[in-house]
């Protein structure tokens, strides 16, 4: 099992798909990495030579921000938005959608489960 950027890649998957298990690498980035390193995208991870795995590891370390570094950068970006008090930062702080989606209905993923407000009975 190849280990790249602290992630164990599944050995039965094609290289193109297995690289997407690394946070920060999607399919287009995986294709670009494989093209740059000269590794066949259809090769299974278990069939890669040690030299090819090292090539992939070196390329990813030098040219791509992945895993912990990328997560830290995203968290710092959100923290900066919150600190400067811009609209996007306020939306993050309140746990509401940030990119202009409607909130009168929907937005349940960001808002969480419904909090039902019952009518009060008159005595």
Curated annotation (Swiss-Prot):
Keyword Metal-binding found: no
Pfam families in the record: Ribosomal_S13 (PF00416)
Entry keyword set: Ribonucleoprotein, Ribosomal protein, RNA-binding, rRNA-binding, tRNA-binding
InterPro entries (alphabetical): Rbsml_uS13_C, Ribosomal_uS13, Ribosomal_uS13-like_H2TH, Ribosomal_uS13_bac-type, Ribosomal_uS13_CS
Lineage summary: Bacteria, Bacillati, Bacillota, Clostridia, Eubacteriales
Family indicated by similarity: Belongs to the universal ribosomal protein uS13 family.
PANTHER family: 30S RIBOSOMAL PROTEIN S13/40S RIBOSOMAL PROTEIN S18, SMALL RIBOSOMAL SUBUNIT PROTEIN US13M
Presence of keyword Lyase: no
The protein's name in its UniProt record: Small ribosomal subunit protein uS13
Gene name tied to this protein: rpsM
Taxonomic source organism: Desulforamulus reducens (strain ATCC BAA-1160 / DSM 100696 / MI-1) (Desulfotomaculum reducens)
One of the record's GO cellular component terms: small ribosomal subunit
Superkingdom, taxonomy of origin: Bacteria
């Amino acid at each position: 099992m190849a280990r790249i950027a602290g992630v164990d890649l599944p050995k039965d998957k094609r290289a193109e798909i297995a690289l997407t298990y690394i946070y920060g690498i999607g399919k287009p980035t995986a294709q670009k990495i494989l093209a740059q390193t000269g590794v066949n995208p259809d090769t299974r991870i278990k069939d890669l030579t040690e030299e090819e795995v090292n090539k992939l590891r070196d390329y990813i370390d030098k040219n791509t921000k992945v895993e912990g570094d990328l997560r830290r950068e995203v968290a710092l970006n959100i923290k900066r938005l919150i600190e400067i008090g811009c609209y996007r930062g306020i939306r993050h702080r309140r746990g509401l959608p940030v990119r202009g989606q409607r909130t009168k209905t929907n937005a349940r993923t960001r808002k969480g489960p419904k909090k039902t407000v019952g009518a009060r009975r008159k005595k």
